[in-house]
């Protein structure tokens, strides 16, 4: 099994793929969640679960059709173009893609190869379920690849997740995709000495209601 530092490097590589190379720029993938009830009405690249390569390919094709020039646009203008065209990734899609990349590098098998459902049929509750993960009770024991679960008791029943990238000297770095935060979409942040940053304070975090740190069994 690889070391924690290896996990961190692998996850950073996975994250960098979500900084889409468009027009000579690195464009952070925006947030995209398919509307409830429309899952089968859109192509897979528009459902908020696609790989960075698929999103990039679709973006280039749509830009060609719409005469949009990435080279002349700012990063935010490109991100707005992606949003308008329903291209991006939601929090569970991002988490799945990050962990799938890690699994392939560490175990030689994809998440599906380990029995996980397809990315389009997986959500945060499934990733953090007792079937596929174990609870990490002490925050300081978290490692790269662990999942931080928030909003387990949210009224809409949809929790949020962030993936831990590293844990060094009391500073835990993480990555997630969110619509509610600033910046929106895929981005990173840090938790210093166990104190949640403003980026994460918009989400509830209540251990008694199911929130906390989870580690995939295949990485435990």
Which residues fall in each region the model found?
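N-terminal capping segments
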Residues: 1-105
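Generic low-complexity segments that are intrinsically disordered, proline-rich and/or Lys/Arg-biased
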Residues: 29-31, 118, 198
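Intrinsically disordered, low-complexity segments enriched in small/polar residues
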Residues: 35, 41, 46, 111-113, ...
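Alpha-helix initiation/capping motif
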Residues: 51, 107, 123, 188-190
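Short linear motifs in intrinsically disordered/low-complexity regions
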Residues: 91, 124-126, 131, 152, ...
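...with weaker cross-activation on analogous glycine-rich loops/strands in unrelated enzymes
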Residues: 106-182
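Low-complexity, Gly/Ser/Thr/Pro-rich intrinsically disordered linker/tail segments
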Residues: 177, 186-220
């Amino acid at each position: 099994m690889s070391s924690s530092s290896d996990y961190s490097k692998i996850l950073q590589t996975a994250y960098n793929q979500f900084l889409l190379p468009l027009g000579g720029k690195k464009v952070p993938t925006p947030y995209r969640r398919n509307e409830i009830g429309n899952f089968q009405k859109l192509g897979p690249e528009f459902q908020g679960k696609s790989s960075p390569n698929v999103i990039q390919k679709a973006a280039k094709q749509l830009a060609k059709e719409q005469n949009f020039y990435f080279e002349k646009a700012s990063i935010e203008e490109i991100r707005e173009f992606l949003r308008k065209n329903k291209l991006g990734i939601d929090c569970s899609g991002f988490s799945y893609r990050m962990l799938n990349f890690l699994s392939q590098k560490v175990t030689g098998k994809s998440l599906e190869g380990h029995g996980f459902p397809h990315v389009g049929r997986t959500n945060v509750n499934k990733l953090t379920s007792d079937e596929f993960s174990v609870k990490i009770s002490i925050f300081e024991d978290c490692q790269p690849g662990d999942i931080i679960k928030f909003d387990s008791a949210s009224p809409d029943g949809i929790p949020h997740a962030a993936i831990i990238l590293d844990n060094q000297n009391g500073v835990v770095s993480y990555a997630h995709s969110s619509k509610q935060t600033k910046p929106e979409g895929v981005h990173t942040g840090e938790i210093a000495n166990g104190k949640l940053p403003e980026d994460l304070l918009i989400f509830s975090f209540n251990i008694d209601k199911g929130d906390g740190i989870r580690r995939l069994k295949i990485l435990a």
